[in-house]
UniProtKB/Swiss-Prot annotation:
It comes from the Bacteria. The lineage of its organism: Bacteria, Pseudomonadati, Pseudomonadota, Alphaproteobacteria, Rhodobacterales. The keyword Methyltransferase applies. This is Ubiquinone biosynthesis O-methyltransferase. S-adenosyl-L-methionine binds at residues 39, 70, 91, 134. It comes from Cereibacter sphaeroides (strain KD131 / KCTC 12085). SUPFAM superfamilies: S-adenosyl-L-methionine-dependent methyltransferases. Coiled coil: none annotated.
Length: 247
């Protein structure tokens, strides 16, 4: 894999150590499995709106080239492929790729998984209609350089979906103390709270990278129903944004 200034080796090592767990809904990635329907709801609605696609069609995203950066085991890549997109999944952790490839093959899906980085793909001239950048930006060494590479990966008119975690006392209490220390949904140290990014900070970085932010929503966990939902107002912990490359 090509080296990149935004890759944080310590962050990559954390996820490499958990590679075999990706498709276990009760394992170390249980929070992502629980959040996935909410993430997919936002992603599909934003893509459909931006590219004028009918989600009731058999393959609504047919003809769209989509990159899933930090794809892990393919929790988002596979649903996007089922909707008809040409999917490339990229991950900096080498052990994630064979896990993702095997599961896609077992599911009868043609997904191009690669052990590479956003910067390497951009340098190679790869371009996409959609870039998924989900729960990655809080793990990179240089968020602005990383988002700039994401911008280079988009065709003019292309769409980037980016999700991350807010940085405030509530997010520390829920994402660090609650999820890692008390509930043990994730191994301790999975997240570094100091790397969390506020919504306004992310919007500023996105603009500096040359993209136009067009939407953002909170992703809110309900401990009673044990489910996630989108919120236009509550961006206090998890949130997701949509941005467009205009030129």
């Amino acid at each position: 894999m090509e080296s990149s200034s935004t890759i944080d080796p310590a962050e990559v090592a954390k996820f490499e150590a958990m590679a075999a767990e990706w498709w276990n809904p009760h394992g170390k990635f249980k929070p992502l499995h629980q959040m996935n329907p909410c993430r997919l709801d936002y992603i599909t609605q934003q893509i459909a709106a931006e590219f004028d696609r009918d989600l009731s069609a058999p393959l609504p995203f047919e003809g769209l080239r989509l990159l899933d950066i930090g794809c892990g085991g393919g929790l988002l890549s596979e649903p996007m492929a089922r909707l008809g997109a040409e999917v490339i999944g990229a991950d900096a952790a080498p052990r994630n790729i064979p896990v993702a490839k095997l599961h896609a093959e077992q599911s009868g899906l043609a997904i191009d998984y690669r052990n590479t980085t956003a910067e390497a793909l951009a340098a190679a001239g790869e371009r996409f209609d959609v870039v998924l950048n989900m729960e990655v930006v809080e793990h990179v060494a240089d968020p602005l350089a990383y988002l700039t590479a994401c911008r280079e990966l988009l065709k003019p008119g292309g769409l980037m979906i980016c999700s991350t975690l807010n940085r405030n006392p509530k997010s520390f209490a829920m994402a660090i103390v609650g999820a890692e220390w008390v509930m043990r949904w994730l191994p301790k140290g999975t997240h570094d709270w100091s790397k969390f990014i506020t919504p306004d900070e992310l919007y500023d970085l996105i603009r500096k990278a040359g993209l136009d932010p067009v939407d953002r929503k909170g992703m809110v966990f309900n401990p009673v129903s044990w489910s996630w939902s989108l919120s236009a107002r509550d961006l206090s912990v998890n949130y997701v944004t949509a941005s467009v490359r205009r030129t």
